[in-house]
Amino acid sequence: MSSGMHVALVTGGNKGIGLAIVRDLCRLFSGDVVLTARDVARGQAAVQQLQAEGLSPRFHQLDIDDLQSIRALRDFLRKEYGGLDVLVNNAGIAFKVADPTPFHIQAEVTMKTNFFGTRDVCTELLPLIKPQGRVVNVSSIMSVRALKSCSPELQQKFRSETITEEELVGLMNKFVEDTKKGVHQKEGWPSSAYGVTKIGVTVLSRIHARKLSEQRKGDRILLNACCPGWVRTDMAGPKATKSPEEGAETPVYLALLPPDAEGPHGQFVSEKRVEQW
């Protein structure tokens, strides 16, 4: 495998929106597409399913909660391709509405994967992104709703153009601590743990886009957060309005922005349109 070969990678690619994104990239992206999943058997089964459709993704194990797993993937990409052209951070979790797990545990578990896991992937893989690369962080419209339910003080912090990654990490940790103390509502947080983790993903995207513009100005890398919509998946359930294929549309659009595109960059995108944050 030569370092001249283009490569796209999708996290959480074995089912739902992730699998639909992999399928589209296999059809539309000129290069290799790597499907990653936490569970090797499920990931390989997804690859076989796509092979039966005449597509040929590669598989690599990735558990975004496990730093060693992330670093093994990083080393694989560096060795096989000399970097990465497209990264779609899709892996994430949500508790069902009726789940009896105590709220503070839901908050901690969801935050660990959706925010901190995604952040760890970015820390390890963003330095590998090649010039004209594309990074897509799958967030949610729930992040916009959760933001509107935050106190004005928190809203101001999350909308700040100068918030640092360290400050954001501090706020995400504070949310989890506040839920443990049972004071999260008094402290101005909304009642959706999932929504807060996705605020984290959207704001992290804004921070990373800003850093790329400052540190790699001429490389024309575009990084955005997006909402796939309300999609029929294991996570959202059967009543959702969109198919996984429809949910993949905006993430794939952002992953395949043409080389000469100036934007969007550092935006929250829904239905292929930039939404106000």
Swiss-Prot record:
> Any idea which positions bind substrate?
140
Its cellular-component GO annotations read:
cytoplasm
Which PROSITE patterns does the record cross-reference, listed alphabetically? ADH_SHORT (PS00061)
Against CDD domains, the record matches this protein to: carb_red_PTCR-like_SDR_c
| Residues modified to Phosphoserine | 2, 30
The residues listed in the UniProt record as binding NADP(+), with positions renumbered to this chain, are 10-34, 63-64, 90, 194-198, 231-233
Instruction: From the Swiss-Prot or TrEMBL record, state where the protein is found.
Output: Cytoplasm
Active site positions: 194
Q: Where does glutathione bind?
A: 95-97, 106, 193-194
Originating organism? Pongo abelii
Mostly located where? cytoplasm
Q: Which residues carry this modification: N-acetylserine?
A: 2
InterPro entries membership: CBR1-like, NAD(P)-bd_dom_sf, Sc_DH/Rdtase_CS, SDR_fam
**Chemical reaction(s) catalysed:** a secondary alcohol + NADP(+) = a ketone + NADPH + H(+); prostaglandin F2alpha + NADP(+) = prostaglandin E2 + NADPH + H(+); prostaglandin E1 + NADP(+) = 15-oxoprostaglandin E1 + NADPH + H(+); menadione + NADPH + H(+) = menadiol + NADP(+)
Q: Does the keyword Lipid metabolism feature in the UniProt annotation?
A: yes
Xref: Pfam families: adh_short
Q: Which UniProt keywords apply?
A: Acetylation, Cytoplasm, Lipid metabolism, NADP, Oxidoreductase, Phosphoprotein
Q: Which GO terms describe its molecular function?
A: 15-hydroxyprostaglandin dehydrogenase (NADP+) activity; 15-hydroxyprostaglandin-D dehydrogenase (NADP+) activity; carbonyl reductase (NADPH) activity; prostaglandin E2 9-reductase activity; S-nitrosoglutathione reductase (NADPH) activity
State what protein this is by name.
Carbonyl reductase [NADPH] 1
State the EC number(s).
Answer: 1.1.1.184, 1.1.1.196, 1.1.1.197, 1.1.1.71
Query: What are the leading ranks of the lineage?
Result: Eukaryota, Metazoa, Chordata, Craniata, Vertebrata
Sites where N6-1-carboxyethyl lysine occurs are at 239
| UniProt-listed GO biological process terms | lipid metabolic process; vitamin K metabolic process; xenobiotic metabolic process
| Known function | NADPH-dependent reductase with broad substrate specificity. Catalyzes the reduction of a wide variety of carbonyl compounds including quinones, prostaglandins, menadione, plus various xenobiotics. Catalyzes the reduction of the antitumor anthracyclines doxorubicin and daunorubicin to the cardiotoxic compounds doxorubicinol and daunorubicinol. Can convert prostaglandin E to prostaglandin F2-alpha. Can bind glutathione, which explains its higher affinity for glutathione-conjugated substrates. Catalyzes the reduction of S-nitrosoglutathione.
